[in-house]
Amino acid sequence: MATCIWLRSCGARRLGSTFPGCRLRPRAGGLVPASGPAPGPAQLRCYAGRLAGLSAALLRTDSFVGGRWLPAAATFPVQDPASGAALGMVADCGVREARAAVRAAYEAFCRWREVSAKERSSLLRKWYNLMIQNKDDLARIITAESGKPLKEAHGEILYSAFFLEWFSEEARRVYGDIIHTPAKDRRALVLKQPIGVAAVITPWNFPSAMITRKVGAALAAGCTVVVKPAEDTPFSALALAELASQAGIPSGVYNVIPCSRKNAKEVGEAICTDPLVSKISFTGSTTTGKILLHHAANSVKRVSMELGGLAPFIVFDSANVDQAVAGAMASKFRNTGQTCVCSNQFLVQRGIHDAFVKAFAEAMKKNLRVGNGFEEGTTQGPLINEKAVEKVEKQVNDAVSKGATVVTGGKRHQLGKNFFEPTLLCNVTQDMLCTHEETFGPLAPVIKFDTEEEAIAIANAADVGLAGYFYSQDPAQIWRVAEQLEVGMVGVNEGLISSVECPFGGVKQSGLGREGSKYGIDEYLELKYVCYGGL
């Protein structure tokens, strides 16, 4: 009992600076908000009231291994990207903690795989219900650690929870097969069995949804997981762990090992090379994905990867301009351009080019508002860090130096070092960085083209192929282009394509496998053929 109280006290001390207006003090059974004025500068205190009522149980700073909250030997700071201020100190796990988490997950797997599909389904449903009950607090955590506008954070929490709901239902639909063989005295059976422990490595841009999309499928299949969240956004993963525990998910089934950027490489290598891990699921950059593939190759592990993209957004002459602009706004500026399926280059046919650029610029000026994610009306929050801002800035400067024209935006925003103005460029050519390097920011470069063949050639020149979009009112053209685009997902007259019911993934160097949909659970299942003779 003394140990438990000490752990809670450690958590309280660490969270004393966590989230403005939500200072915590220990008490038996958990953490409660402390009284007194909100700490920190006025820039942070301006939204302190929105966090003051946050559930203390969801503000976790330790690792979650084997059903227990465990501190690490060191901690690392998590920063608010809007102000740069430290939100709190989180356990900085290393190789030792990573291996302990894998061991806990393996021991739990030996029990979890025997749990009936109906019971697994019920537990995932309880987890989903708890997410819905706590959706406001979970959304505020996302906004605090990622800068995402609160309205979008609420949307992510619902999207995230829906994966648990979906896979709670899919858990009961894992069917095998019977194959008739030429021999009359034999029967062939095909069983689907859970693959084992899955190492799950997730990004910062969707700190909740990228976890449940993977973990929901894994747990539904009968696998257990070790989650290494992005160092920028560990609080969401830890809050999910608390709710998983409350839902009755057995100890060791869901484990979380946060770590700093300094430790990320060795922790990632430790869990991906551990012989007790059978599966690796990763969302992140193509460069990191290739490193993890190398780790997986040494022991031939199953791998799912959702990597970088360079999504083309094509507007043909037959397109409805207003519809295309609405799709462009949704596709490009969600999460301030920091999504893997954001349109990266806009290919606009000559006949409609000027009308589209004019309408797009007007829509940007009218509808986009840069600000702190907690401020009502904000549509564009900060980028995750200054390095991300520098990348956008570099691409804009490169394009302008080579002849591109800034229609609107084009520079850092006065709000702070992590803010950049929503930017529209025209007169863009294919020799510019922004056309062959993923931006991950609020930059929309427009390339003028003449023929359908030219647009397809530009779009397919990339060595990645996650998503693509195009707008056309020509039925024959729609079929041709949809089939010819070398991407895993296509939006036809639609800028928002993600859905829990549909398979998410790419081709070429954008990844392996699919997540979500009825196909997502197959990534965590092995096929076993059983030949039954002597009948």
From Swiss-Prot:
N6-acetyllysine-modified residues are: 126, 265, 365, 411
Q: Which GO terms describe its molecular function?
A: identical protein binding; succinate-semialdehyde dehydrogenase (NAD+) activity
Residues under site feature: Transition state stabilizer: 205
Localization, UniProt: Mitochondrion
The listed outcome for residue 255 to S is:
In SSADHD; 17% of activity
Q: Where does the record locate the signal sequence feature?
A: none
EC number(s): the record gives 1.2.1.24
Q: Which residues carry this modification: N6-succinyllysine?
A: 126, 135, 184, 265, 402
Q: What does the annotation give as the result of altering residue 334 to A?
A: Reduces catalytic activity to less than 15% of wild-type
Keyword Disulfide bond attached: yes
UniProt note on tissues of expression: Brain, pancreas, heart, liver, skeletal muscle and kidney. Lower in placenta.
Q: Which residues does the annotated transit peptide occupy?
A: 1-47
Pathway per the UniProt entry: Amino-acid degradation; 4-aminobutanoate degradation
Superkingdom of this protein's organism: Eukaryota
Q: Give the UniProt family note.
A: Belongs to the aldehyde dehydrogenase family.
Quaternary context: Homotetramer.
Q: What does this protein do?
A: Catalyzes one step in the degradation of the inhibitory neurotransmitter gamma-aminobutyric acid (GABA).
Full protein name: Succinate-semialdehyde dehydrogenase, mitochondrial
